[in-house]
Amino acid sequence: MKITPIAFESLGVRSQATLIETKDLRVLVDPAVSLAPRRYNLPPHQREVDRLTQLAKVLVDVAKDVDVIVVSHYHYDHHDPGYVIPTDIYKNKIVFLKDPQNMINNSQKYRRAPRFLRSIKDKPRKIEIADGKTFEFNTTTISFSPAVPHGADERLGYVIQVAISDKDSTVIFTSDIEGAPKDVHLKFTKEKMPTVIIIDGPLSYLLGRALKEEELENSIRNMEEIIKNGLETVIIDHHVLRDINYAQVLKPVHDIAKDLGVRVTTAAEYLNLEPLILEARRKELYKEDNRPAKIPRGLANLLNAGDG
């Protein structure tokens, strides 16, 4: 099995787009890229826009050769109805979707999911509602969790986690569980016993606003619990990498992982690259170059459509 992070916060954008390849098939999970519409009361910097444009092209190129596309939920850093990523990437693919009708919040149920489904209409070879189901492809198994809360607050909606297994290993993509603040977030991982897990981490940059101290502590404790589950590698990237102090936030997790011989890494480091932290450094970027960014129309429409 080969795991290739395509776009993540440590690679410069909001995303969890990941390519997973087994000898039977190639799976692309959550093919979308986005930026924070506002951060530190500043719009995206030109460096962020340029990086998004670059990674969008990579994502489209990767999508040409995949067999399966997974959409874990309907936030714009996980799916795209055509703003930046053309919906032609779904042509002739098997598409596994989060249920657009059940265990879903209103903004996704009545606006985002229907719009997305209209945008890909008649393009995929097959569309499957994936929640809680398992699919076999020769020696590869793709399993999905039932819908679980998008972090501690169900108002943000629900996501599905995905496990991909071949004869040798299992990878779990947690989607947006915000570092697993609830015990229900751990159930799928304990059932599947993965060798590799890709997890988003807590919303620590919103501590005191959208995240309570108790929820952050629960997330760290549960990520420590995950590491004790027989893992070889943990890729922690996405929400927590929006925090300029992410390394300090994750220090307890790194300490336990080190004792257990588990590799904990960002997506960039997994690719043997230096993390490219842009959103969390937006103030610094504007100090270096305060010219307004030239934002393409599609990206402008995406940013105007709302955060997340």
UniProtKB/Swiss-Prot annotation:
GO terms for molecular function: hydrolase activity. SMART domains: Lactamase_B. InterPro entries: Metallo-B-lactamas, RibonucZ/Hydroxyglut_hydro, UPF0173_UPF0282_UlaG_hydrolase, UPF0282_hydrls. Belongs to the UPF0282 family. PANTHER family: UPF0173 METAL-DEPENDENT HYDROLASE MJ1163-RELATED (PTHR43546), UPF0282 PROTEIN MJ1629 (PTHR43546:SF4). This is UPF0282 protein SSO3251. It comes from Saccharolobus solfataricus (strain ATCC 35092 / DSM 1617 / JCM 11322 / P2).
